């Protein structure tokens, strides 16, 4: 079954809108899913075509200097991680859909100028985190994951599989593009908000790929520590931890073999 489930409130509707549309974003591959899984088991970044290149290195050298460019790569190489590991799957195997329609299909939601339109955005993808915006319109977030929230106006938002975000927009022009680009910037889903069928607005170019930072990589660790009161006393075997700098450049990954996992309380 493919679709969204909208549950109306038991009492009066608290969010005023003249028109209401559901926009369900998803992704699809024509490959055998088990073949996709087998590829990822062999090589986790099989579908990542945004790997750092020699041209990126020379660009960083010209902008930041040789030392900074080398240090930037040294850190990631020592961790044996990719700074562009943003998604397991990319447009190399996925098609990004809006209400089951490809970007070329131009699914359209209708409105009349001056109406308050509620767009119920649903991420029904199996893999993709989407960054959503509507060029030319502000998005007022009013409802998140089944709960009304204090309205906040944004230009763009990111949501992952299983999340829902409702926004209010007040369009004035004839057509707007609902643009949802994948977090790894390899593709996008799009729909159109228009006064009649057949119209479309310009589709933005994909944003440049941004490297992950240490805050991205360490965020999960810090959340896990605060939420579960993780004890570090059992990690004495990690001799490399003693010399770990803020950039983790000096981290001795070879010493992790002596890590006493039994002493870690979760």
Report residues per predicted region:
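Ligand-binding face of N-terminal immunoglobulin V-set domains in extracellular IgSF glycoproteins
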Residues: 162
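Ser/Thr/Pro-rich, low-complexity mucin-like regions
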Residues: 129, 173-174
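Short, hydrophobic beta-strand segments
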Residues: 165-173
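Histidine-centered copper-binding motifs that mark active-site loops
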Residues: 1-133, 137-159, 167-168, 197-249, ...
């Amino acid at each position: 079954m493919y679709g969204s489930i909208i549950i109306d409130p038991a009492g009066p509707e608290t969010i005023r809108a003249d028109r209401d549309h559901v926009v369900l974003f998803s992704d699809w591959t024509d490959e055998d899913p088990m073949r996709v899984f087998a590829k990822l088991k062999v090589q986790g970044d099989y579908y990542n075509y945004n790997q750092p290149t020699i041209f990126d290195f020379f660009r960083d050298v010209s902008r930041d200097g040789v030392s900074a460019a080398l240090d930037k790569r040294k850190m990631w190489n020592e961790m044996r991680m990719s700074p562009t590991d943003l998604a397991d799957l990319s447009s190399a195997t996925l098609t990004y859909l809006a209400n089951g329609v490809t970007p070329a299909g131009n699914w359209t939601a209708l409105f009349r100028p001056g109406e308050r339109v509620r767009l119920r955005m649903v991420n029904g993808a199996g893999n993709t985190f989407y960054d959503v915006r509507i060029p030319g319109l502000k998005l007022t977030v009013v409802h998140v994951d089944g709960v009304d929230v204090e309205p906040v106006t944004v230009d763009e938002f990111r949501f992952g599989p299983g999340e829902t975000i409702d926004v209010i927009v007040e369009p004035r022009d004839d057509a707007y593009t609902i643009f949802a680009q994948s977090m790894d910037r390899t593709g996008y889903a799009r729909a159109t908000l228009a006064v009649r069928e057949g119209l479309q607005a310009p589709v933005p170019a994909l944003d440049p790929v941004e490297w992950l930072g240490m805050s991205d990589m360490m965020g999960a660790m810090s959340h896990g520590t605060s939420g579960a009161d993780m004890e570090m006393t059992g990690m004495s075997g990690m001799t490399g931890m003693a010399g770990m700098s803020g950039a983790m450049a000096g981290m001795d990954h070879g010493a992790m073999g002596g890590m006493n996992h039994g002493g870690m309380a979760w």
